Regions:
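A general structural signal for short secondary-structure boundary/capping elements
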Residues: 85-90, 101-105
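Short S/T/G/P-rich N-terminal loop/turn motif that feeds into the first structured element of a domain
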Residues: 1-54, 63-73, 96-105
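A broadly conserved amphipathic alpha-helix scaffold signal in soluble, globular proteins
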Residues: 69, 82-85
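A common structural junction motif
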Residues: 29-31, 76-81, 88
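Conserved catalytic core of Hanks-type protein kinase domains
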Residues: 61-62, 87
Length: 105
């Protein structure tokens, strides 16, 4: 069963250009160094009025739960998590299956 892992990031102060570039650099490492994911996207919100303070969204897909767990435990992901938390970011994560029960269109 494939699944989607989404994380919203809320930093107390907006990242400057260097901070955003570093965040993107770290995420760009994942496919080659962690593996196991079938899709990775990282984007900044284009509408701050509706985000409740979340500036970025991370979108990933995995073929199964063991691949998600391996990603979460991988040292490269742990390094990214430390980087995010050191900036007093409040991440909000949501995981759900990509199957016939979640298809709308």
């Amino acid at each position: 069963m494939s699944l989607q892992h989404i994380v919203l990031f809320s930093f107390p102060t907006d990242l400057d250009a260097a901070g955003e570039a570093e965040m993107r650099r770290q995420v760009a490492r994942w496919p080659g160094e962690i593996g196991g994911m079938t899709a990775v996207r990282l984007g900044r919100s284009i509408n701050d009025e509706r985000t409740r303070g979340h500036q970025f969204l991370l979108y990933t897909e995995f073929p199964d739960v063991p691949a998600l767990v391996a990603y979460q435990q991988h040292p490269v992901h742990q390094e990214f998590l430390r980087w995010v938390l050191e900036r007093q970011c409040t991440p909000l994560a949501f995981d759900y299956p990509l199957d016939e029960t979640t298809v709308v269109l």
